């Protein structure tokens, strides 16, 4: 009995909603003399902004989600990424930041060090591709460091420092000296008040990033 009442209520609610949407349309398309006409916005009508046009803070940078965590890994090919870079270029993006170079066992480039630690071999070298596309469309690329996943479980940042000291050197030697589009580094580690050793870890990783690259800009996750 209760299920039937609920179904009746939903049917009535749906009919009432449809009627509410249809009634204004029917009234709007019938004149006083019974003739029909189509409503359209006046060509002379325009929005009246109370602030100057093109006076806002322009967004010129964006993050590249390397899709190794929440979304199936590497589900775009280079054609899709190339088109995405074209769209970004057209709207004024000149800086792209890879959120992270890997998470746990999924990685974005064939790192000898991380493969030796049990990570999976990626199907494509996303880092190389991003750098080539950034160079093609005159953008700067920022490399996001590796996320071991251990500190999410333990809140201990020492894992990040240990792994990334090899990743930083490896990446700079492989890509940094090769591509002019390599613009800097991103320490992607997210922290909280429960994270152990965050200040020391950020200092150690950030200093190494700058030292190997001749002082390229290095920033941290907000």
Give residue spans per PLM region.
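N-terminal export signals
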Residues: 2, 8-30
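C-terminal segment of N-terminal export signals and the immediately downstream linker at the start
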Residues: 25-52
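The substrate-binding groove and active-site-proximal loops of carbohydrate-active enzymes
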Residues: 65-75, 111-122, 153-162, 188-196
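Short, acidic/polar
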Residues: 74-88, 164-173
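Aromatic-lined substrate-binding rim segments of carbohydrate-active enzymes
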Residues: 83-89, 97-146, 201-215
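An active-site-proximal structural segment forming one wall of the substrate-binding cleft
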Residues: 123-133, 156-182
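Active-site groove signature of glycoside hydrolases
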Residues: 148, 170-197
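Extracellular glycoside hydrolase catalytic/binding regions
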Residues: 190-199, 206-222
């Amino acid at each position: 009995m209760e299920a039937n009442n609920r179904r009746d209520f939903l049917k009535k609610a749906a009919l009432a909603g449809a009627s509410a949407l249809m009634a204004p349309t029917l009234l709007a398309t019938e004149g006083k003399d019974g003739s029909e006409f189509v409503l359209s916005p006046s060509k002379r009508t325009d929005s009246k902004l109370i602030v100057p046009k093109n006076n806002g803070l322009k967004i010129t940078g964006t993050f590249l989600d390397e899709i190794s965590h929440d979304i199936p890994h590497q589900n775009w090919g280079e054609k899709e990424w190339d088109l995405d870079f074209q769209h970004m270029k057209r709207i004024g993006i000149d800086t792209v930041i890879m959120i992270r170079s890997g998470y746990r066992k999924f990685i974005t480039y064939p790192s000898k060090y991380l493969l030796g630690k049990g990570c999976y071999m990626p199907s494509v070298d996303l880092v190389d591709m991003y750098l080539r596309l950034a160079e093609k469309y005159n953008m700067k690329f920022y490399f996001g460091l590796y996320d071991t996943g251990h500190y999410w479980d333990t809140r201990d940042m020492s894992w990040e420092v240990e792994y990334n000291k090899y990743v930083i050197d490896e990446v700079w030697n492989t890509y940094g000296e090769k591509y002019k589009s390599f613009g800097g580094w991103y320490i992607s580690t997210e922290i909280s008040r429960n994270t152990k050793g965050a200040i020391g870890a950020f200092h150690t990783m950030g200093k190494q990033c700058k030292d190997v690259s001749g002082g390229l800009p290095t920033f941290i996750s907000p």
